[in-house]
From Swiss-Prot:
It catalyses: D-alanine + acetyl-CoA = (2R)-2-amino-4-oxopentanoate + CoA. The keyword Transferase applies. Involved in the ornithine fermentation pathway. Catalyzes the thiolytic cleavage of 2-amino-4-ketopentanoate (AKP) with coenzyme A (CoA) to form acetyl-CoA and alanine. It is strictly specific for AKP. It holds the Pfam family PALP. This is 2-amino-4-ketopentanoate thiolase beta subunit. InterPro entries: AKP_thiolase_beta (IPR053471), Cys_Synth/Cystath_Beta-Synth (IPR050214), TrpB-like_PALP (IPR001926), TrpB-like_PALP_sf (IPR036052). Keywords: Pyridoxal phosphate, Transferase. The keyword Transferase applies. Heterodimer with OrtA. It comes from Unknown prokaryotic organism. GO terms for molecular function: acetyl-CoA C-acetyltransferase activity. Its cofactor is pyridoxal 5'-phosphate. It is an enzyme of class 2 (transferase). PANTHER family: CYSTATHIONINE BETA-SYNTHASE.
Length: 472
């Protein structure tokens, strides 16, 4: 008898489908409605750092170059007060097989799928991760399906996303293209059930453990060359896996005093699931449309408990404008001779501003570059923005209005980073944890977990809970 594939029926079966597609029983880590054993989940489901390094070495992933951006550092110093302007370094993750750090994330999932005997892998993604999964699956001779949100209801798609679809197909993947909306998860569940494929989720412990090598490597490389740890590690932040994995790796390397700073493109006011807003943004990842909601409620993904938990690790969170990232993309190419895409250049734009805060003998490291899709060339995305009624001009970045105006800076001194209120986001996360789980009474175990999950303490959590009127 054929299974009921109506939306409600598939959603009712999602726990069963996900358990089979990951080979992981999340129930054993649950402590309460709020708390779960995060480190226990990472230890049991993931691989050790040395095991991951071996897995990645076998598939050509990792050990990417660490480059000093001397010319960009000089420009940052010229726009800093005397004696300030930290050295800016960048981890050239574009050297990975598919052109981004996502190869690290995909490598462990695909290795695990092969080890467990799955016939293939599936990933729901807008771009870079799909290319990484397809590339790694090709190496392991596994089937691969990539499910992408590509179009709005007019069937119009952004150049960057369409180019990344082509890249996935070039690696031999079957690409299922969807319009924006709630069907992404639904279609993914149906395909997982039909094919028996492994869910190469961005948010599983396998994916996050794959990124830990990035944080570990960059600390090792900086110590070997400069005999010190970086003052700031700047990470492009979207769904939280980049921040989580990089920070965990840096901590495992012993870099306890390095400040972890997330950076996102400011797309405030645009709704990521809105058909109307879908093509009004010029960035498909690394923006606040993912960065804020995934930080304030990480368990909104295709796994029961998200291994990407950015508030556990973020010390600061800043935003830059679309125009600033486009400007820095051009600067990196013309000043440093490196043509790279917007994901890494988001954190580079922030790093330029952040470097001005520190003395010249300190180090700011940007932990990724990427080289995939049309997004590495600003003109395709800017032309597309104009076609969708967005004004593009030169001027002051503060004039940027997401969905209306993209303002390209006129000079280097105009690049700034806007601080986000992390405590406000932490309070929002705690409220979501209580309300979404319908919690009426909070236990000491819940308070301990929430303090760890927000990088705060019991007093902070207790104060927020009392403000919400929940019984302790």
């Amino acid at each position: 008898m054929a299974k009921d594939t109506s939306y409600d029926a598939v959603m009712d079966r999602r726990a069963e489908i996900m358990s089979r597609a990951l080979g992981l029983n999340y129930d054993e880590f649950i402590i309460s409605d709020i708390a779960f054993d995060y480190e226990g989940m990472m230890a049991k489901a993931g691989y050790s750092l040395e095991e991951v390094r071996q897995i990645q070495s076998e598939s050509g992933v990792g050990n990417t170059p660490l480059l000093e951006l001397r010319n960009i550092t000089d420009l940052a110093r010229k726009t800093s007060k005397r004696g300030f302007g930290a050295r800016i370094l960048i981890k050239d993750e574009a050297a990975n097989p598919s052109g981004s750090f996502k190869d690290r994330r995909a490598s462990v999932s695909i290795h695990h799928a092969k080890k467990l005997g799955y016939p293939g892998v599936l990933a729901a993604t807008s771009g870079n991760y799909g290319a990484a999964v397809a590339s790694q699956a090709a190496m392991k001779n596994l089937g691969c399906i990539i499910v992408q949100e590509v179009f709005d209801s007019r069937h119009v798609g952004q150049p960057e996303i369409i180019e990344k679809s082509r890249k996935c197909e070039a690696y031999g993947a079957e690409v299922v293209q969807l319009t924006v909306g709630p069907e992404l998860f639904y279609v993914s569940l149906i395909l997982l059930e039909e094919t028996g494929y492994f869910n190469a989720s961005l948010y599983s412990p396998f994916g996050i453990s794959g990124v830990e090598t990035l944080g570990y490597e960059l600390v090792e490389q900086i110590r070997a060359r400069y005999d010190k740890d970086p003052a700031y590690i700047v990470v492009t932040h979207a769904g939280g896996g980049n921040v989580t994995g990089t920070a965990r790796g840096a901590l495992k390397a012993g870099a306890k005093n390095s400040t972890i700073i997330g950076a996102s493109v400011d797309l405030s006011g645009l709704h990521m699931a809105s058909d109307n807003d879908f093509n009004k943004k010029s960035f498909t990842t690394g923006h606040t449309g993912f960065g804020v909601p995934f930080a304030t409620w990480p368990d909104r993904t295709d796994v029961p408990k998200n291994a990407a938990r950015p508030l556990r690790y973020l010390d600061r969170y800043v935003t830059v404008t679309q125009g600033e990232v486009f400007y820095v993309t051009e600067a990196l190419a013309q000043v440093e001779g490196m043509e790279r895409g917007p994901a890494g250049n988001t954190s580079l734009a922030a790093a330029i501003a952040l470097a001005r805060e520190l003395p010249e003998d300190e180090i700011v490291v940007v932990q990724e570059t990427e080289y995939t899709g049309a997004g590495k060339h600003p003109w395709a995305q800017l032309d597309f923005a104009k076609q969708n009624g967005i004004a593009v001009k030169r001027g002051a970045p503060k004039e940027n209005k997401p969905g209306k105006t993209i303002v390209i800076p006129q000079n280097f001194s105009q690049i700034t980073a806007t601080e986000m209120d992390l405590n406000r986001m932490r309070r929002s996360y705690i409220r979501n944890a209580l309300e979404r789980n319908k919690v009426k009474n909070v236990t000491e175990e819940d308070i301990r977990f929430l303090a760890e999950d927000t990088k705060t303490d019991a007093d902070f959590v207790t104060s927020v809970i009392r403000d919400l009127g929940v019984r302790l």
